[in-house]
């Protein structure tokens, strides 16, 4: 979902990493939904991508479920 929203705004991964103040590597992990960002980065991500409350909830649920699944293995 993050990648799709970024692409709709025609932002590159490099541009997003600059806007969020994080490394490109960190942003790529967020973009690929491999990592849940820190709270401050998540706030900036919400602002930059204009995420709705519904999208935020969906993203956090998905990432939390992904995290729990990988801890089970």
Positions of the model-derived regions?
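Short, charged recognition helix plus adjacent turn
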Residues: 36, 40, 53-73
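Short basic helix-loop element that most often maps to the first helix and adjoining turn
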Residues: 1-19, 44, 71
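Residues in soluble alpha-helical coiled-coils and helical-bundle/repeat scaffolds
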Residues: 7, 32, 50-51
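Key DNA-contact positions within bacterial/archaeal DNA-binding proteins
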Residues: 14, 25-28, 54
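Short, Lys/Arg-enriched C-terminal cap helix and immediately downstream tail that follows
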Residues: 39-43, 48
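Recognition helix of helix-turn-helix/homeodomain-like DNA-binding domains
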Residues: 22-36
